[in-house]
Regions:
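Helical hinge/lid and interdomain linker segments adjacent to catalytic or ligand-binding clefts
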Residues: 1-48
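Short amphipathic alpha-helical segments and helix-helix/interface helices
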Residues: 13-21, 94, 146, 150
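Short, solvent-exposed loop/turn segments at secondary-structure junctions
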Residues: 3, 37-39, 111-112, 125-126, ...
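Acidic-and-aromatic substrate-binding clefts and catalytic sites of carbohydrate-active enzymes
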Residues: 8-11, 110, 136-138
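Loop/turn elements at helix/coil->beta-strand transitions in domains of secreted/extracellular proteins
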Residues: 25-30, 102, 122-125, 156
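A recurrent domain-boundary module in secreted/ectodomain proteins
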Residues: 129-156
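An acidic, glycine-rich "communication" segment
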Residues: 32-119
Length: 156
């Protein structure tokens, strides 16, 4: 993998980090989800500072127990596909992300209780998932989770 490919697929390029920082500092709310939002941003001090200072999460490793596809949060248990298959977008090693500052955990992988998602409420709000939102298997669960996220963003 050459440097240009790695830069092209970077979760948050330097330019994107500046835009997101400015957006959040002006009171914007942001939802981030993906299998590599922690691991991809853990390589340099600058990237770690961005995720911790702006998005309010840190990286704690990847979930390696392939037998677990359950995630608990928002009062329910949801499932994501972990093993490659022909029907779903599989997530073999989703990221375990932890809250920093006054952020708090909102989802945990089960079993094991590693943090799968965090939320932050300050002058702006973040909601970050260590797995892709679109990988939630049940359409009903996706709708309920999204309603919860939007409710968090709009509550006074």
């Amino acid at each position: 993998e050459d440097a240009s490919t790695k830069a092209y697929y970077k979760t948050f390029s330097s330019a994107m980090q500046r835009i997101i920082s400015s957006y959040c500092q002006s009171g914007g709310n942001i939802l981030v989800s993906g299998a590599y939002v922690g691991s991809d941003m853990n390589g340099t001090q600058g990237n770690r500072e961005f995720t911790q200072r702006v998005l309010k999460y840190g990286y704690q490793g990847s979930l390696t127990d392939k037998n677990s596809n359950r995630i608990n949060g928002l009062g329910r248990t949801i499932s994501i596909p972990r093993l490659p298959n022909e029907n779903n977008y599989a997530i073999p090693a989703p990221d375990c992300i932890v809250p920093v500052d006054s952020a708090f955990p909102v989802f945990t992988y089960a079993p094991g209780n590693q943090s799968a998602g965090i939320a932050y409420k300050g002058n702006y709000r973040t909601f970050v998932l260590g797995f892709p939102f679109e990988s939630i298997l049940s359409e009903a669960d996706r709708a309920i989770v999204m309603a919860g996220i939007l409710g968090f963003f709009t509550q006074k």
